[in-house]
Amino acid sequence: MFAGRLMVRSIVGRACLATMGRWSKPQAHASQVILPSTPAIAAVAIQCEEFTANRRLFSSQIETESTLDGATYERVCSDTLDALCDYFEELTENASELQGTDVAYSDGVLTVNLGGQHGTYVINRQTPNKQIWLSSPTSGPKRYDFVGTVAAGRWIYKHSGQSLHELLQQEIPGILKSQSVDFLRLPYCS
């Protein structure tokens, strides 16, 4: 299934990153070289000088801890999706330049087809994660967490800090050029 494994070991002041073959034996110390038991499988060991234990080895993320209980999440999520559905229906009804548009909302899934040239947006609830997921033909998939209070909260993509409504405000006006678009006036975008 996988040709190799990735192993990271850290020792005070040093780290060793190695790709090991399937039958390689783990190294005892970071300074040792990994020798595969099968000659066809190569191994690479890289010594990393001046490794800092406090260094973040992943992308920076914005804190988005949701404090909503289940019932509040359901209400906030439903209010958000209902408002988006109503607004998309209003926008597509007034969009004379778009052919074949359709807006459908059922069982927590909002599907907005903006025609063959522009694609389909899918916005849906993810109750187990207390998230709203977006699939955009322009920017791809994103997962939004609710941040803030019910009175002053918004749905945030934790990797960029951009809200759901900000992303829609960025993408949709480029499609609906003949009318003004303002997603930032909808609930839960403050």
UniProtKB/Swiss-Prot annotation:
Pfam families: Frataxin_Cyay. The keyword Cell membrane does not apply. The keyword rRNA-binding does not apply. Belongs to the frataxin family. PANTHER family: FRATAXIN (PTHR16821), FRATAXIN, MITOCHONDRIAL (PTHR16821:SF2). Promotes the biosynthesis of heme as well as the assembly and repair of iron-sulfur clusters by delivering Fe(2+) to proteins involved in these pathways. May play a role in the protection against iron-catalyzed oxidative stress through its ability to catalyze the oxidation of Fe(2+) to Fe(3+). May be able to store large amounts of the metal in the form of a ferrihydrite mineral by oligomerization. Required for ecdysteroidogenesis in the prothoracic gland which is necessary for larval to pupal transition. GO terms for molecular function: 2 iron, 2 sulfur cluster binding; enzyme activator activity; ferric iron binding; ferrous iron binding; ferroxidase activity; iron chaperone activity. Transmembrane segments: none annotated. InterPro entries: Frataxin, Frataxin/CyaY, Frataxin/CyaY_sf, Frataxin_CS. It comes from the Eukaryota. This is Frataxin homolog, mitochondrial. It is found in: Mitochondrion. It comes from Drosophila melanogaster. It catalyses: 4 Fe(2+) + O2 + 4 H(+) = 4 Fe(3+) + 2 H2O. Disruption phenotype: RNAi-mediated knockdown results in nearly absent pupariation and reduced ecdysteroid peak level required to proceed to pupal stage. RNAi-mediated knockdown in the prothoracic gland results in delayed or absent pupariation. GO terms for biological process: [2Fe-2S] cluster assembly; adult locomotory behavior; axonal transport of mitochondrion; determination of adult lifespan; heme biosynthetic process; intracellular iron ion homeostasis; iron ion transport; iron-sulfur cluster assembly. GO terms for cellular component: axon cytoplasm; mitochondrial [2Fe-2S] assembly complex; mitochondrial matrix; mitochondrion. Keywords: Heme biosynthesis, Ion transport, Iron, Iron storage, Iron transport, Lipid metabolism, Mitochondrion, Oxidoreductase, Steroid metabolism, Steroidogenesis, Transit peptide, Transport. Coiled coil: none annotated. Its EC number is 1.16.3.1. Monomer (probable predominant form). Oligomer. Interacts with IscU. Component of the mitochondrial core iron-sulfur cluster (ISC) assembly complex at least composed of the cysteine desulfurase Nfs1, the scaffold protein IscU, the accessory protein bcn92/Isd11/Lyrm4, and probably fh/frataxin. SUPFAM superfamilies: Frataxin/Nqo15-like.
